[in-house]
Amino acid sequence: MSVSAFNRRWAAVILEALTRHGVRHVCIAPGSRSTPLTLAAAENSAFIHHTHFDERGLGHLALGLAKVSKQPVAVIVTSGTAVANLYPALIEAGLTGEKLILLTADRPPELIDCGANQAIRQAGMFASHPSQTLSLPRPTQDISARWLVSTLDNVLATLHAGAVHINCPFAEPLYGDMDDTGLAWQQSLGDWWQDDKPWLREARRLESDKQRDWFFWRQKRGVVVAGRMSAEEGKKVALWAQTLGWPLIGDVLSQTGQPLPCADLWLGNAKAVTELQQAQIVVQLGSSLTGKRLLQWQAACEPEEYWIIDNIEGRLDPAHHRGRRLVAKIADWLELHPAEKRHPWCVDIPRLAEQAWQAVAARRDMFGEAQLAHRIRDYLPEQGQLFVGNSLVVRLIDALSQLPAGYPVYSNRGASGIDGLISTAAGVQRASAKSTLAIVGDLSALYDLNALALLRQVSAPFVLIVVNNNGGQIFSLLPTPQSERERFYLMPQNVHFEHAAAMFNLKYHRPQSWDELDAALAGAWRTPTTTVIELVVNDTDGAQTLQQLLAQVSHL
């Protein structure tokens, strides 16, 4: 009997089972213990293969692929700390709903807790963060192929959102020629190999029912809060709110067109807050809200009813409002709850939103990161997409810009970490094959610098704007101790990215004016390659501009 041959047949069943649950993208890191899984993936023509040498970046690459494809993405890594490096992407997927299937190779049980090399306790290492975990036994013909495939189907059928961790131990030898070992075991699945459906099919209903009193609530004074959603959902939500005559507060990830722009500015105005107090119902569609003033208002508001609609299960309201938590796809929910044409009930808020926008526009000529956020609409590629980093940049875009309705916007706003942002953006581009503009800060770029290797393979123009404000300037907005702010919070690195781009053979520009940025972008959008554009800005201007605008708008 050939152990290596049967390992590969066992792995072939695992990978084939994944195809029956919509998996098309497989992300693979190099490793020896994962050889059976890697070879099985390589031999399966249903897969598109992606490789990366860094498992942390690989997990985020898969996250980006899943964001766009809306299908589960598989990740294959070897044993040991390679597995632990998937933790950040797994956590993010659990909070934002992308579906990942983590296939982690492992040593067999007899090599755990005995000092064997590269052997750690992998089973259950991710605690409660995966939606499901499955620890497979060592491959053996004593266990039927039917057990293996039906066990996988049972776990994968429950993957509504988040990650599944499937731990796969393999004994040595891992290499060798294929022979007939396990052929009959594999063939016991019969014509399943020629089929395209799961061995075990399970139906699971998640959609919420129509709220029978909706006809009553839609006649009341309401507010619509739009969080993270798809581009198509964003357009539908905007039309729905407009028909109802309800003010729409749109997050940067809502893709609603933000008809009341600069919400995180005007929500700091007492007149706006007073008018919003008249709302009898708040309907929040989508989660992961960004703006500080929006979150403060959301926590303090006390409507008669607060409804949250999102396809992700679980609690999504840190303010714990009295109301309804409805699990549904946003587009489906809107169809079940049609709007009734009514006149807008808000008077002050549209005026304040326009005045806030004009206050921001009056500062647009200065070369800085706040102005970049305001101008970002002008730099979006036609028929393309935007990926927004975390920390200060996403807050500035949320507060100071107005993105087009239905324009795709992606970000990692679940755990909101600065790790893996470039890798995630690379996955977004690969899955969509669209022109992509990605914006991150300098520390975020340093954190994921080796992801520039992924940007050597793009299928459409990709522009990475690194806003270099020399450190974590988000902390300038917080009451951090002034005496220790630079040393322990901002941590300026005093670096530039020209040599990093050159190391990966990527085009690079460092514009010092809006005209130079326009020229760099015009050239970048003409070729299907990656261009790194570094905007070196004054350290504190972005944070200070936001604070000045908040003060100005609060007194309108």
UniProtKB/Swiss-Prot annotation:
Homodimer. One of its GO terms (biological process) is menaquinone biosynthetic process. The keyword Transferase applies. Pathway: Quinol/quinone metabolism; 1,4-dihydroxy-2-naphthoate biosynthesis; 1,4-dihydroxy-2-naphthoate from chorismate: step 2/7; Quinol/quinone metabolism; menaquinone biosynthesis. GO terms for molecular function: 2-succinyl-5-enolpyruvyl-6-hydroxy-3-cyclohexene-1-carboxylic-acid synthase activity; magnesium ion binding; manganese ion binding; thiamine pyrophosphate binding. It catalyses: isochorismate + 2-oxoglutarate + H(+) = 5-enolpyruvoyl-6-hydroxy-2-succinyl-cyclohex-3-ene-1-carboxylate + CO2. Belongs to the TPP enzyme family. MenD subfamily. This is 2-succinyl-5-enolpyruvyl-6-hydroxy-3-cyclohexene-1-carboxylate synthase. Pfam families: TPP_enzyme_C (PF02775), TPP_enzyme_M_2 (PF16582), TPP_enzyme_N (PF02776). Its EC number is 2.2.1.9. NCBIfam families: menD (TIGR00173). Catalyzes the thiamine diphosphate-dependent decarboxylation of 2-oxoglutarate and the subsequent addition of the resulting succinic semialdehyde-thiamine pyrophosphate anion to isochorismate to yield 2-succinyl-5-enolpyruvyl-6-hydroxy-3-cyclohexene-1-carboxylate (SEPHCHC). Binds 1 thiamine pyrophosphate per subunit. The gene is menD. Its cofactor is Mg(2+); Mn(2+); thiamine diphosphate. Keywords: Magnesium, Manganese, Menaquinone biosynthesis, Metal-binding, Thiamine pyrophosphate, Transferase. InterPro entries: MenaQ_synth_MenD, MenD_middle, THDP-binding, Thiamin_PyroP_enz_TPP-bd_dom, TPP_enzyme_TPP-bd.
